[in-house]
Amino acid sequence: MGKIVFMFPGQGAQYVGMGKDFYDSFACSKEIFDKANEVLDIDVKKLCFEENEDINITEYTQAAMVTASVAILKKIEEMGLKPDLTAGLSLGEYCALVASDVMSFEDAVKVVRQRGILMQDTVPAGEGAMSAVLGMKKEAIEAVLPDVEGIVTIANYNCPGQIVISGESKAVAEAGEALKEAGAKRVLPLKVSGPFHSPMLKPAGEKLLDVLVDVEVNDPKVPYVSNTRSEERRVGKE
């Protein structure tokens, strides 16, 4: 049998109803949602299961995403499946850290709750945006962006043929039109409320250090891949 990787989604993959089947069907998954409601100042179950607009607002999305992902993880673990490696796209790295036992679920969900608040406060909803650019090489994108007025930059190299741009809402929209004119097959606005992975959020990252300093961090029982370094990590405190 080949090696198994547990990979977790990032912000933008959220939807109303996520995790509800697991909550209704499995005690181990229900326990995760119940724990989230106990340790946070928001009703995560209501956020995930009932129709609402808050699920797409950063300060709420991140805690909801991590809760739903870990709820599914716990059932997979209960089935006896074990990973050889864990990884996560952006926010999903926190779920990977839980899966690798680097931090507890309770700590992770509290950290991402504060992370979401800091990010939202730094760039209020509507002022920043992201779009996925399909069918265009990074060199071509890099040639277009400097001519756009405002802040817009490449944020994620998702895979060959799919690159994400991020920045001020107006600049991202203008860049999208310019990129389509320059040959991009499609430019798709992402379902996020902020300019993630852009210089606009640097102040939020600096403030998050004050939150992380009190978190207990362990060496991983399962290696995980760092988003920052794009390499396998076997030490927790780095």
Task: Label each residue range with its predicted role.
Residues G2-I141, R186, L190:
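FabD-like malonyl-/acyl-CoA
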Residues Q11-A13, L40, S100-R234:
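Alpha/beta catalytic cores of group-transfer enzymes, especially the acyltransferase/condensing modules
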Residues G236-E238:
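Positively charged, low-complexity/disordered segments
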